[in-house]
Swiss-Prot record:
Keyword field: Amphibian defense peptide, Antibiotic, Antimicrobial, Cleavage on pair of basic residues, Secreted, Signal
TM helices/strands, residue ranges: none
Coiled coil: none
Protein name: Raniseptin-6
Propeptide: 23-49
Record flagged with keyword Cell wall biogenesis/degradation: no
């Protein structure tokens, strides 16, 4: 009877240990997923910022081009 009792305790102990290890791995996996999601969100946010910056540069380039064109036209065809 004592042998059976020890075997049962051993099985229960090993089951609890393996269960706790699985729970720990699950928590680590969830933490890694959260970090990956945060990194993806940062990447999407950075992309939005870059697109906004490129749009501003594009607008600035158009304005500078129009000003330069006006200066060149005034130089070539001066008003008298």
């Amino acid at each position: 009877m004592a042998f059976l009792k020890k075997s049962l305790f051993l099985v229960l102990f090993l089951g609890i240990v393996s269960l706790s290890i699985c729970e720990e791995e699950k928590r680590e996996g969830e933490e890694e997923e959260k970090q990956e999601e945060e990194n993806e969100e940062l990447s999407e946010e950075e992309l939005r910022e870059r697109r906004a910056l490129l749009d501003k540069l594009k607008s600035l380039g158009k304005v500078v081009g129009k000003v330069a064109l006006g200066v060149v036209q005034n130089y070539l065809n001066p008003r008298q």
